[in-house]
Amino acid sequence: MKKHIIYFLMLLPAVFIASGCQKYETGNPPASTVANFTFSTSNSGKAPCVVTFTNTSLNAAGYLWDFGNGQTSTEANPTATYNTPGFYTVKLTCTAVNDVYYNQLVKTAVINVRDPNAGLAQVLYYTTCATAGGAVHMVVLNDDGIAHVQDFAPVTLVKPYGITTDTSNKKVYVSDYSVNAIYRFDADGTNPLKILDITIFPALDAPEGLMVAGDKLYWGQPGGIYRSNLDGTSPELYKSSIDYPADMHYDPVGNKIYAVVDMEDGTGGYFSMNFDGSNLVNHIPGVDGLAIEVNVATGKAYFAGYAVAGTAMPDNGIYTSNIDGTQVQKIGEYGLKATWGVAIDDKRGKLFWSFKNSNYAPDGKIIRANLDGTGKEDWITGINPQAMQAVWIKL
């Protein structure tokens, strides 16, 4: 009997140990919180761009984002806008569901917003009229403020009212209202090629405003916005909701089109719409816009307006407004004849516009001023300027 008691006492601790081990191994620990995210950028990661964040965190009760640009958010999947090149440290802090030591509540990542102008030259391209025919010119902008004009290879032009650039492929496009043609040049003004005329596209009619978006060229003419491939092939009507865009501006970040509409052959007005044609808004009805430039970074739009009594632009002149069309004000004169030229030097905060007193005589000039119209100077004189655009491009 004594022997059995000894055996029982020896086995008793083992029973308790086995029971304790079994309970520990089969239990479930509280779930941890793990912060994590991925992101994608618009505009190929070049400023300005929008970064979209996708939250992949586990078991979180809340979120606090610090985007490194002065902005924060508590949304699960936010977006952030970066207007300036640089490195930005993004920090996501999650609120834990359970207070356990193995939570991972913070995730950081560095976003490199690239400089879109690195290795590029800033160039003002513009067209002119003359009795002997129209022409295209360029000026490389620099800090000395001196206009060193270079001429493009000659082509047949009479009223070159539209100009735009394809910076990705280093090309310049010019439309002629009178000749019914669109030409393409290399960025340095060489290798001219007529890519569209009425023999190629019989519907081509008095093309004016031009813009490039992606792999397409867009232009305005009676009937709406038309487009083709960048080499002029496959021309077609794109959108008829704006009846005659005299000039257009494409915002790649917001994916929007801004346009002014000719009053003589169209309904007039300053419009914006999503790139797919949705959300069409007439911000300034009835105005006769000839040229437009939009500065998305400052929230301002600039126009060459032809006088229409009873509208926000009752006199000929250069106007500015907020992008939504509010606070319209006149900031300059463009002479006795209508002009199709407005451009912005975004590096130096300058505005250019065409000034002319006749249709063909060299009695005009390009005026340069501050963005509010102050500090005007006659920058290039003895010309008859028409359309213009300032861009960063590789020559």
Residue ranges of each PLM-predicted region?
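Extracellular/lumenal mature domains of secreted and surface-exposed proteins
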Residues: 4, 21-120
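Repeated scaffold domains used in trafficking and secretory/extracellular systems
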Residues: 158-164, 204-212, 243-251, 287-295, ...
